[in-house]
Amino acid sequence: MEKFFIVGSHGLKGEIKVSGAKNSALPIIAATLLTREPCVLENIPKLEDVNIMLSILKRLGSKVEFGQLLTIQNNRINELIIPEELARKIRASNLFLGPLVARFQEGVVPLPGGCNIGNRPMDLHLKGLRLMGAEVEEKSGFIRARAKKLKGAEIHLDFPSVGATENLMMAAALAQGTTIIRNAAREPEIVDLQNFLNLMGAKVKGAGTDIIKITGVNQLKGVTHKIIPDRIEAGTHMVMAAATQSDIIISGVIPEHLEAVMAKLKEAGALITSGGDWVRVTGKSIIKPVDIKTMPYPGFPTDMQPQILALLTLAQGTSIISEGVFDNRFKHVEELRRMGADIRLESRIAVIKGVPKLTGASVIAHDLRAAAALVIAGLAAEGMTVLEGIKNLDRGYENLDLKYQLIGAQIKRVNGEEKY
């Protein structure tokens, strides 16, 4: 079982290059099922979640080659059931349902796994597919959807769910007629998916707004597409710089995707400048308290909540964070308390009373973003932190430890009983 040894590291300096967006890569990998022609994807991060999605494709009959580029060919699909043991590992396995029904008239997915951060039901996905004419049955932990030909429909999402928006966009791309998704998610990753689908020959417009219109076509073609940079990885590095009073340039980013995080870090006292594809963060010795409510994009991202909470444990004053997207997303709090943080939880609200310092401790990462928060806390703390559960970190960050070593951070990956 691998773990990190992290020694408090302040005043880091250097540049960190951001990898491709995990949350773009996963739906776009699923979308390749919409064509029998080969698709070539650039800037795909080498992550555990990506590997699981590719394993699922291979089990369905796809030919996959993953080196510098990712090439996928889906001309010999011979299985329409997503394997349960793989689906259990990743929530995004449900994104195969829309493409399978659209191209092969049927798909079967087990109820998916991934990070256990509260109730993330598939109801909105299934409601949309039913409106498009699919027959959907839920039985013994599996969902089966069938339709001879999906039909365009008007779909109003009760909540701007990213996964439901993506699944329905993909399904609608090969449907007969026009589909309109209202109250659609507006995340940059949705825009990236639209761009990929349109390169393939789909007719999708409106991504990035809350109304997306898709006019179905008969078939789609293979294309080459470059994935956008990962805004959550970028935001994580920005918070790390602020927490460790470091001066870091984060490159290969789209600054407009980071506006909510930049605004809150400025409020907390960090100095931030940005240019075409970079953001520079200089952390200051005094961290100011900040109040935050996580919301769907363009609000403050729930995927950045654990990281900024770690920063605010060191603020001079009291901060309040309201989790507006998921319940059960405060698993990092108990671990931060072990390091000396003063945090009170009330349902979906965390009240964080800043302390003068955190102290290294043995902690466990229970999910992906909690892992990132604990890395930040470990680097900001005095002494050594031992972080277990880093397989959760590897699901969404490509070589985070190596990237941080390059700017001078003392972070070391070890196996099992190995000592620092």
Curated annotation (Swiss-Prot):
Phosphoenolpyruvate binds at K22, N23. UDP-N-acetyl-alpha-D-glucosamine binds at R91, R120, P121, M122, D123, L124, D303, V325. It is an enzyme of class 2 (transferase). It is found in: Cytoplasm. The modification 2-(S-cysteinyl)pyruvic acid O-phosphothioketal is found at C115. Pathway: Cell wall biogenesis; peptidoglycan biosynthesis. Its EC number is 2.5.1.7. GO terms for biological process: cell division; cell wall organization; peptidoglycan biosynthetic process; regulation of cell shape; UDP-N-acetylgalactosamine biosynthetic process. SUPFAM superfamilies: EPT/RTPC-like. HAMAP family: MurA (MF_00111). Belongs to the EPSP synthase family. MurA subfamily. This is UDP-N-acetylglucosamine 1-carboxyvinyltransferase 1.
